[in-house]
């Protein structure tokens, strides 16, 4: 028995109650196929406030070459373990305060490392509102319930009559009270709950039905497929479940989850009823009541919540993957750019930027309807290109984008210029943000938005970190998932991307600096202020002069920042300052200076890595140093490429079934990808149309911003939907 109050037969699951003491390492090892030594080393480094980018890049020899994903998993599982221990201690304290902690119950709580099992153990002791069972116990009916549950042959009417008094008016009321108590016992039975959960996980069906009063509303039509829907919950795709839950949240459908009621009740009867006599009928009634009133609602909600959490996780994974690809999009680099935020009546906002992205000039031109001042606009753009030595043109992909692109390509410039169409998703959010106001206090939102479009071409990572990732528009049901978990994952993704590329310490914005390993918002602000007061950093060591940037922060951050004209050439590489002495020794052994070793493949080939192993830096670290010396400060991002849409397609009505068109992947979901064809509406390539054969993961076939060829298979102008195929 779980505790003395329960006369129910309890079946113990010995596998989950093995008598051993769990620790964090064992808990993590059960979930991950990672050696104990690697887990312990990682936990120690995390406890020392080392960041994941730092550990994965500069502590490979300690962790056994774990990557960022594995280190992140260890960190999450360790937090999960700590939360379980805290919850366990809270439960033990609460039960003890109620003087109900038996040695058996204490042992089961201490040995359990399953949250649901812990909550089931705690269920009888939880503080709650008064229940039917509580009311029956107050009337003195618990002994009657125990006698019935003992399932020995009794004259129940005679037995129940003994409990008739001022508070219990009849034998039936006494039996009803006993059934209420038994129903609660059945609800609290761990074996019953555990196996019902298993049945729900395996067999639950989710159904949705339209809310009649709202089904004819225009907004409801996008959810029309869920007006009458039924599907196995275990097999429902994440995007469909989130869509159904959104439809319910907006009041258009009602959702239910459940299993076959008769099967569930039969299982409970088989578990609880051990005799065939007069008591069986009362216990069966209690079982049916317990299932309908207590078990089914609770476990149904639990199961749906589990499914929602899995769907959230999948959606967040997709969002994070899309964000990573967007942040690591090819940069054009330090070029002088003319950027245009296109428009019709309000005009095209034009800005000229220098190599650092600083604003040189801005004005508004009106080449399109209703003004049609294309001649004047051409003349002014030619003048700006010459005056500011423009090297490339960046056009936002929103309203009037195609018309502006065609207009620009008609201009006869004195020299060849690359013309790029850039996603402007989130540019309006940036332009109205505090960051934008601080950068451009004397300019309005239209100028700030155009500047962002230009800077995105030069360096997407540096510009996009200024925008709330949720505003970039590459997520799947991003507003429906757990928002705190989404923020954690997106922040982690941004941090990974920033540190995989590295940043220029003398030009990086506060936003970009705040994502560098070991540097938060406050320290980033201090760095920017120090730079403003003292000028450019001469070397990495100067970072230590920044207020509140101590030795630990320096250790975590130094190798991720670059100084292009430092007196030490290693400051412009990913070699950590702690390894400078090793590189200097390598150069000395080869009879050359350090700067002569960098990028010198012939000399680097002569280095014996084994010779330079130290107690702090092993063979993996030495090999990374040698690799970095070959190509110091290598940017992992590819080079930007010019892309051209089909000039014959300017609007949806220009599309015809069977057309093969160039496009750019602009969003990836679990069910396929969306492709920009150069018009307002993006087309969908369903996962089944990505390539011949089965595709389990869209990311195996396409990446965000990938240039693709697609065939138009269906155009639905009324619903503004375009179906595409990559099977040509």
What are these regions (language model features)?
Residues 4-7:
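Short hydrophobic alpha-helical segments enriched in small aliphatic residues
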Residues 34, 330-332, 495-529, 647-685, ...:
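C-terminal accessory/binding modules appended to enzymatic or scaffolding proteins
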Residues 70-73, 80, 84-339, 345-431, ...:
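Duplex nucleic acid-engaging cores and interfaces of nucleic-acid transaction enzymes
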Residues 161-171, 229, 268-291, 295, ...:
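Low-complexity, acidic/Ser/Thr- and charged residue-rich accessory regions of DNA metabolism proteins
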Residues 302-320, 471-504, 612-657:
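Long, charged amphipathic helices and adjacent flexible linkers at domain junctions
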